[in-house]
Amino acid sequence: LWFLSEESGWSHLYVSDGKGAPRAITSGKWEASQPQLSADGKRFLFLCNRAWPGDYEVCEVDRNGGTVREVTALDGVEDFVVSPDDTKLLVRHSGSYLPPQVAVVDIRGGKATELTDTRTPAYKARTWIQPEYVQVPSKHGAGTIWGKYYGPKQLEAGRQYPIVMFVHGAGYLQNVSARYPNYFREQMFHDLLVQRGYIVLELDYRASEGYGRKWRTDIYRRMGTPELEDYLDGLDWLVEHRQGDRARAGIYGGSYGGFMTFMALFKKPGVFKAGAALRPV
């Protein structure tokens, strides 16, 4: 029997013979997901985010445990299947502005052979503002809050920039990753905002996926409080490190992000000068 468990505080792979306590095959402050047993039954393949929480690769480990090896080097693996002869992986992967594509990777490692490119010539001709993955220190004892920052390549000396903060939905969802975002439309809007002189920050606030059990469950019976603390810390970070103008800060989001927009406006009136709660729940 093999399964995933958060017993350690992080999602990891365990095996059990049904007689004794389950034994961990993987460990560490990262998450294992989508495990598959190889056709010969000798090793497990799974997704892992060992390098940083938003970097997903296919990893491999012996069925008895040991060293974990990263098979791919694509940064944004979405899912995969193993060939019947255990020699190749069919991988679906993506990037910040790269919609999911299909590639083949030798299971021993090596460069991916791309099978698809669904982007149009017009799309590929555009120059997009790439997100910067940032670590915002929590002033509320939560540790590191991962974020995606969009801004000009070079900040103008002495200039203060109006701020837009985006709140992802679902709660238990990871938005700060190297993958193509669920919120690709909002990402394109953020690209436009930067062209219009704004700076933008998205955060994987407490409740988000990919950061361990405690981060995911920290809002239990207090929804709307830890998440807002994280966004207030993000606002401080923009002011202190990206020349953000605290007097011109707005916030928006949809679904749970809409709920959090309301929480920000109602619980901290005056901090955000504008808010847009889209389809709030």
Residue ranges of model-derived segments:
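Multi-bladed beta-propeller domains
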Residues: S5-S8, S16-A39, C48-A51, E60-E78, ...
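Serine-hydrolase catalytic core recognition
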Residues: V77-V281
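Short catalytic-loop micro-motif centered on adjacent basic/acidic residues
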Residues: F3-L4, E202
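A short loop-to-beta-strand structural motif that recurs across blades of beta-propeller domains
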Residues: H12-Y14, E57-C59, Q101-A103
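Short, solvent-exposed loop/turn segments at conserved positions within beta-propeller repeat blades
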Residues: E6-S11, R50-Y56, G95-L98, R185
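Hydrophobic beta-strand positions that form the internal "hydrophobic ladder"
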Residues: L1-F3, F44-L45, L89-L90
